[in-house]
Amino acid sequence: MAAEWASRFWLWAALLIPVAAVYEDQVGKFDWRQQYVGKLKFASLEFSPGSKKLVVATEKNVIAALNSRTGEILWRHVDKGTAEGAVDAMLLHGQDVITVSNGGRIMRSWETNIGGLNWEITLDTGSFQALGLVGLQESVRYIAVLKKTTLALHHLSSGHLKWVEHLPESDSIHYQMVYSYGSGVVWALGVVPFSHVNIVKFNVEDGEIVQQVRVSTPWLQHLSGACGVVDEAVLVCPDPSSRSLQTLALETEWELRQIPLQSLDLEFGSGFQPRVLPTQPNPVDASRAQFFLHLSPSHYALLQYHYGILSLLKNFPQTALVSFATTGEKTVAAVMACRNEVQKTSNSEDGSMGSFSEKSSSKDSLACFNQTYTINLYLVETGRRLLDTTTTFSLEQSGTRPERLYIQVFLKKDDSVGYRALVQTEDHLLLFLQQLAGKVVLWSREESLAEVVCLEMVDLPLTGAQAELEGEFGKKAAIQDGLLGMFLKRLSSQLILLQAWTSHLWKMFYDARKPRSQIKNEINIDTLARDEFNLQKMMVMVTASGKLFGIESSSGTILWKQYLPSVKPDSSFKLMVQRTTAHFPHPPQCTLLVKDKESGMSSLYVFNPIFGKWSQVAPPVLKRPILQSLLLPVMDQDYAKVLLLIDDEYKVTAFPATRNVLRQLHELAPSIFFYLVDAEQGRLCGYRLRKDLTTELSWELTIPPEVRRIVKVKGKRSSEHVHSQGRVMGDRSVLYKSLNPNLLAVVTESTDAHHERTFIGIFLIDGVTGRIIHSSAQKKAKGPVHIVHSENWVVYQYWNTKARRNEFTVLELYEGTEQYNATAFSSLDRPQLPQVLQQSYIFPSSISAMEATITERGITSRHLLIGLPSGAILSLPKALLDPRRPEIPTEQSREENLIPYSPDVQIHAERFINYNQTVSRMRGIYTAPSGLESTCLVVAYGLDIYQTRVYPSKQFDVLKDDYDYVLISSVLFGLVFATMITKRLAQVKLLNRAWR
């Protein structure tokens, strides 16, 4: 009974550990969150002059509505991040948005005003092909869902199934298009590649097959993305082999009609797949007779097919993007073109057509030199350009170009046409344009930040006055300036600081009279400087699209951005800080290593992380694939750390490669080691550097890939500091930590997927000698595994398949009560293995990311920051994951303040550091030290970005915000006044005593 009460007491004591919380008036003071939706896949703009929103579906499986006036997210629904949540199609009708996701398995209807779910149904299995609205009696009533083998009709209001019919010969025919225009029938169009097209007409009321037509098309491979239905159900397909258009009236004809393009002085581009881009403003009415023909990457033609006659309305030989839009009875064509006449070709990926838009075919497409584009509107009936509809805008980043164009058209009071345009560029930038002389770009969104792949924080530089003060104490300044010069420099520096302090005080008094919401703290990159406690830093973010950002950490303001157009999708990135701002007047320097996934080739980019400018230092040209990169503590004469690059021939390239650097590498080569991991072969190899900059294999470890595979290799952070080298135990002895900076944690997972035979293994390996320090395995466990490796401990999380729960396992390494070598660590001189303590805990939730807090000196207690699938970030004290927690408390364990062991780790809402500012689909957490030992800066990134500060041991080195300055000042003044009075009274008393 006593043990039970003691256990409860220690449990309550653990719950009383200080937590980091915020008051209501502190929300947004030290933290911020930015929400994103990702790269657009579909977009629909409401066609009304008072419309304030646009609905989008993205490649991040997000359905959202954006405020068209500000660009803010009105509502957002985030589906699963896997292929199950992918949005396959989206249609907008009135106040309803219809989406199909999960490969055609789920169809939903959303209310556009608040984002509410109207209905959701599960569709039959089968490969999804197309989605369309079906009108009947001048109203849209049904939704047609075309799959590989079936065509189904659902009620628009409820989603209930009206009928479903099997498609004839679906085994050999690829049905890809569905069409209806309110005539009581719906067509399903399929193709047998390079053979024929099959057209099946269904009755809307009962699903009966009314007609089936087979037409020979030996030149046609695909219907979708090539053909289109124009006018009253006329199928138009381009035929590159005969350089003509083939037409077929679905209602009346059974053979294709060939119309040569030579009669219109048009010609297809060589090697380019032409496309027909039709428009159907209303599902109840037939498609417009006018359509765009995409002839080559930059050549479009506006054609009209009416009563069997094809005519050219307007030719656009130099065009980037086109789009249709309708308001009332007017349909216009929007054409985007480069403003300058001189253009050049560039290479990228192929594109495809989206809803209400056209995605540029990137291969051999044209890009502007000056990055300036114009948008003009043309009346589709005549091809005449509408006056006063020209909008000109410029793109900031060179190398990028518009990729999608969406147009929102409305009628003005004078019956003229006005419009707004949504443009998406290759670097995932969203621009919303309007027709105003003063401000064309209404708002912009950097959606590439929805996929941050690596991140670093860089200290801000000193101000000019601070830099001068720093330079006063140098030896060169004393020799050059002399005593009088140094005195005058000090005097001028102090005057500058006095002026800055006076202006700062004036701003504080001026802002004190305003509400906090009205205080504008404008951040300018030219006046950016380090604050008193180094809490304000520059966040350098690299995104998957190849775009770099410089973001000020205290406000989230984007100060600079750069785009790398040559970066291909699925490339891997590694960002390294070679020189910080501590080496004035040398500018800080970051190096980005980009590796192409397909070819394996790598490239280096060197830039200034504060101003975002490319460095004048030329990086080496990498002619071989890079296997490993090392940032050494060795510096050149300009204080830049040396970067070693090891290629597939095990040759080493140094950057920078000056004489000073090569001399230092020649001296330090025997002490430079590195490792390589080949996960496919299950090999870990250790190498050492020779004096001639070649490599030598020092050890090799093979893990059988047919039994287990390597999933993660985790080392320690080079920037972390360990303050205490041991732990004081209850008997006053010291248990010394095993602080091996070369230790690697290798996580393996079984290849057998059966839940009874799965296991997770971990190896602790010395990266210099290849010695296995410790190995363990968790049977009946599987990943994904999240791991944190710091100081002398390793924490990793996995899924227990037997108990069906998430678990933590913590490992701690100790040398014992005697320290082998207290002055220097050497992996080559370690005769005894360290003691390894291990313990497991149950965690009630899966996790998305995990990282440990870090501070400047390592004095503050460590916390684990755990990102949950709900978007919350849990700050868990490392003391709760201590393998020395006893099951039965003893006198010594109480002396050490060890919490009695309990297998459950509870989640308390008070430990959430982001309260209700959740981070959707979190992928990583980054921590960085500040100038205050108590404070750790945290950035969580995923679909959103969240930045805050945490205080694992509370703020012991700075006064709190609610500190009562008035009270302490009044007490001090009172004490001084009382001292003066008491002194006077004492003097009078002594004088009176002397007279007696």
Curated annotation (Swiss-Prot):
Domain of life assignment: Eukaryota
Coiled-coil regions listed: none
Secretion signal, residue range per the UniProt entry: 1-22
Sugar attachment sites: 916
Record topological domains on the Lumenal side: 23-965
GO CC, alphabetical: EMC complex; endoplasmic reticulum membrane; membrane
Main location: endoplasmic reticulum
Record-annotated membrane-spanning stretches: 966-986
Membrane topology: Single-pass type I membrane protein
Segments on the Cytoplasmic side according to the record's topology features: 987-996
Keyword Disulfide bond applies: yes
Compartments in which it is found: Endoplasmic reticulum membrane
Self-association and partners: Component of the ER membrane protein complex (EMC).
Function of the molecule: Part of the endoplasmic reticulum membrane protein complex (EMC) that enables the energy-independent insertion into endoplasmic reticulum membranes of newly synthesized membrane proteins. Preferentially accommodates proteins with transmembrane domains that are weakly hydrophobic or contain destabilizing features such as charged and aromatic residues. Involved in the cotranslational insertion of multi-pass membrane proteins in which stop-transfer membrane-anchor sequences become ER membrane spanning helices.
Similarity field: Belongs to the EMC1 family.
Listed name of the protein: ER membrane protein complex subunit 1
Species this protein is from: Pongo abelii (Sumatran orangutan)
Gene name of the encoded protein: EMC1
